[in-house]
């Protein structure tokens, strides 16, 4: 269970690390279904995953090795999707779940266009509230 704020993305663009609610971009049975994932890559960036480590190359050419202390488990290095490179267009974001080994995300159905974003998650609650960082 989560509480999100729809107004956030009317005024600002998603930022790296945001947990966002968005409509599934892939054609098929999940098209339009709401997903909750973390923003990993921003427009114009390249996302490379090597042995489970996420490496971002920004539009300016800076290399960022993501510190992902929020992950639920260590990503499996043997998964093909954990050893790929993804290039984002001007209006695209790369989304990944925090439960990487069992997450259907941008590694499977591609980048998410800006207009698919619905809300920024602020709180999750299950037997108490937790602020999303």
Language-model segment annotations:
Residues 1-133:
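Soluble "head" domains of membrane/secretory-pathway proteins
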């Amino acid at each position: 269970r989560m509480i999100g704020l729809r107004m956030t993305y009317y005024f600002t663009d998603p930022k790296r690390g945001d947990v966002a609610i968005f409509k599934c971009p892939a054609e098929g049975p999940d098209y339009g279904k709401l997903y909750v994932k973390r923003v990993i890559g921003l427009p114009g960036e390249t996302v490379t995953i090597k042995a489970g480590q996420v490496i971002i190359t920004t539009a300016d050419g800076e290399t960022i090795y993501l510190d992902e202390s929020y992950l639920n488990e260590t990503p499996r290095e043997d998964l093909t999707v954990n050893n790929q490179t993804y290039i984002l267009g001007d209006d695209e974001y790369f989304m990944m779940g925090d439960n990487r080994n069992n997450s259907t995300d941008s590694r499977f159905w591609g980048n998410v266009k800006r207009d698919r974003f619905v809300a920024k998650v602020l709180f999750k609650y299950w037997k108490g509230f937790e602020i999303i960082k």
